[in-house]
Each structure stands twice: as C-alpha cells, then as structure tokens.
Amino acid sequence: MEREPDPCPSLPYPAPEPDADPDAGWSLPGWTYRDPEFLALETRRIFRPSWQVVCHVSDIPAPGDFHRLDYISESVIVMRGEDGMVRAFANVCRHRGARIVDQPSGCAKRLTCPYHGWTYDSAGRLTGVPRRAGYGALDMGAHGLAPVEVEDFHGFLFVRLENDGGPSVAHMMAPYVEEIAAYRFEQLRALGRVTLRPRTVNWKIIGDNYSDGLHITVAHPGLRRLMGDGYGVEASQHVDKMWGTITDRPSSHLSERAYQHFLPQAPHLPPERQRLWTYFKLWPNIAFDIYPDQIDFMQWLPISPTQALIREVPYALPDARREMKAARYLNWRINRQVNAEDSALIERVQAGLASESFSVGPLSEEEVALRHFCGRVREVIPEARLRERPDLGWSHSSPPLQGRGLSR
C-alpha cells in the first residue's frame, strides 16, 4: 500500500530566503527521535566531541578527591592529584578493561581495579601490578589510565572525549562572560548531591523543551504568574539564552508569593539582576539556570533512542541569612512543579513522535533557539533533512564530516 504524499512540502509557511537553508523553518523529522542508527551517529559526531560538565573545583578540594560521569557507554573520572592538579581519566583498567570506580564521588589515594588489583595513583600512573614478573618487560609508564581532556571554566570542570577542532567552553561562553561575572562562579559551592532523573524520551526533546519560550505562557502557569509574558529568548552560535524578570505583583500561589517576599538583596549583583532569572544552554545538552539565589546545572544524556537521563546539581554562594535559605527552598518548590509540568509535556511529545503520521513541523520565527539547534544537527548529520527514515543500514554510508569541527 502506497503512503500518502507528505503534506509538509505543500505548506506555504515558511518561505526560505535566497541562499538560506531550505529546511530552516522546519523541525527535525520525527524518525530522528526514535532511530537507533541516528543515535549512533549523534554519539560519534555530537557527544564524543562535545564538552560535558562533571563537577565544580570545590567538589574536589583535596588530593584524591574525585567525581565520576557516565555517558554514551563511557565513564570518566575527574580527580585532584597529590600535586594539586585536576586531571581526567577513562574509568577503565588498562589490564582487562574493567571499570575501576563505582562510586559517583569520593576520595582515594590510589585507584585499585577490583578484578586483578592493578593500582593507579591520583595522577593516573600505573603504580602496582600483582605478579608483575609474569608480564615480562611491561612498560608501566605506557599503561596509565587513558587521559581525557578537561577544561576549567570559571570553576566548573568540563571533559571532552575527542577533540574535533571545536571551540573551548570559554570560547562558546565568551559573548556572555561579562554578564555572568557578577555571579562569582569560582566561589560557588554545591547545595546538594548530584540528582539523576531518568526520562522515557529522546535526549533532543528535553533540549527542545528547555529552549522553547512559546510554551511558557501555555503550560507553566506558575512561571507566567511570576514573570507575566516578559520571557526573552535568543540564540548565538554556541549558546541559547532565555530570561525573565520576577514581577512585583504578588502571585496568587503561596510558594511563589513567598519567594517574591523573602528573596533578599544579593549584594554582589547589580540592581537589574536582583529579580532576574536567566537560563543558558550550551551546545548540545548542557544548561545552567542562574537565579539571584542560586545556580542550577543540568545536562541530558542519551541512554537509548527513547530514553535519557537528566543529571543536575544546584550551586550557590555561601549565605547564612534566613531569608536566603527560605528563598532557595521556595525556588526548589517552584521549579519542582515546573519540572513536573515539563516531564508530562516531553513524554507527550515522544508519544506523538512515535506516530508515522508526523514528519516535520513548521517552526515560528520566534522559535529561534529550536531553529538554530535543528540547523546544527542537520549540519552534523545531513540525513536529518530527510522527511522519512532511510533504509536499514543507512548510517554506514553517511558521509564523514572530513575533519570539520562540529562545535565551531
């Protein structure tokens, strides 16, 4: 039975400008949110060369302190050495490939593989091999833990599995470095432990929703009560930015009204930022929400084509004032409700994208962040322009990027 022609090409909106991307006004096809081969290419071309946040330098203050990040079948340890330097390694023993560290964080003078007892120091060097004589002329210096690139961006530690020539985190955030300076990232401390929240959706849906300003007034009544309709969105080459100012009009909701009341002045912030909520999203999957009272970091990591893991942790400047403690608790209550609303929305989208009836959807000119993200994905994986899924095995013939930095 022949399928009906795709109605989307006949829609009059949007009309591309001369020399513009003909797909600029359209979403990614539905099949890209559920296809295993597409995820495999995303893993190689997007996630392996992208920066991923692990922790803050204050989370590993002493020699031997470490944090672990697991994603796309890799496990990375960020660790402070006895010399005070921060390094990152693959969490894989060089003997038989066993994972070494199970804890999400901790402190250890040595890392010992639980399989055969190979031991590494805090700089990743191989220092102990049981029954070493049996390995002949084993070069200990050549069998340390595999290093992983690490970048310290104003106190936050990012890792990158592969360098494809793309920019540093500092370069990506350069347009906003003066804006965030007042928040004193280097002095932040964690308010709690890392939280992991599994979601039965494709990872892109979480990011699409995060940068979507149009749904705020429809699906988040609490944010509308707090900010009215004054929610801004912009997209730059590597970063999306969203923002809204807390209104003076008391909310009808108790937690929101209490937050408006108790939120104290932050002496380190200029007047225009005392009531401003700002959100940044770095390509491809990292976000940080900047509030006057705290800063929340979040990333969404793919598990399968229809499963993702949200990893998040809040940070703040030390402040013992009762009003600030109350504001931070109320912030959590407000955003817990927002997260519940978003969870329902993204699961609704994933369910809809499972239908063969959906190919692509038109994007408003106001959806600047989503337009930009879709364009980046199409640049990295050209098959994302296809309205229908290619035949099985299509990814094996996908043209390589020929050394082009996908993050440039």
Located regions from the model:
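N-terminal short leaders/motifs
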Residues: 8-36, 98-114, 146-154, 228-264
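Generic alpha-helix structural propensity
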Residues: 33-37, 49, 71, 88, ...
